[in-house]
Amino acid sequence: MKSIKLDIKKKNSLRLTKQEKKNVIQDFEKYGILKFSDITQSHKLLFNFINQFSLSYANDANRRPERFDNSRIRNVDAGNQEIFLHSETSFSPSQPEIVWFYCVNPGSDGSGKTVYCDGLELWRKLSPKYKMFFLENPIEYKLRVPINKKISGNKKKKWFLEYPGVRNCFLNYRKNSLEFNFIKFAVEKSRIAKKLSFANHLLIPLESEPQILGRGFLNKKKINKEDYNYITALAYEITEEITWKKNDLIMIDNLRFMHGRRKINKKNKSRDIVTIQTMISNFGFGSTTSLK
């Protein structure tokens, strides 16, 4: 993770020059995760800053309350439980390119640290045995996605969702949801040419994500428990922590990094982190990385 301290003269607007924006993009594509220390107390300026890198935003889960009268700024998941490593919404077509976290309050005791794992490094460390398995066998997720507005009807209706990997798509009127299977590989193309990243939703327990009804491999292949535990242990071996300070902003390449959270102590009731999800960035994918 690279730390960036913005010029204090920019604090009243956070408007970057073309060169300053280019420098941020170059660092982002190289490191994949950036920290902007003590960026601002203004939630409006915060969103304006993020908007300089965003073409569109992802529709975050309804379970996360809206913050600061901005539907794009949401709470992180509630509760004190540990959240295991994952790439945000990597189980569906709604996977954002960039995930942002902003610290409103780091909390009273420092518990609940955000953690991150570089999928490029994890993929590099996996043996050919595992690489061959994941390159040959895509994951199939069985999903039920809530629909924000009430839909009327009694039966399921066949539905068309125009995205590669979607099949068996139905509107479920009784559940007020969209149900479908989604086929996705565990590895992603990265912003660095010819480099792959292991970034997915394989390492979390299913009960932690209500939208996932089932998860397996398309051709019924399975990973045995020993191999699964090895990959999980390897991921956490290279996992690092973020020590939050008030007004810090983190920018994460969601197609490269997996993130999670340590358990929050029950007495730590003041921890307050919010998230914004850039669905599509407004700069070219891999636009600053050299072809090597």
Task: Please give the residue ranges for each predicted region.
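TRNA-binding/sensing appendages of the translation machinery
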Residues: 25-37
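Cytochrome P450 catalytic domain signature, combining two hallmark sequence patches
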Residues: 54-62, 131-133
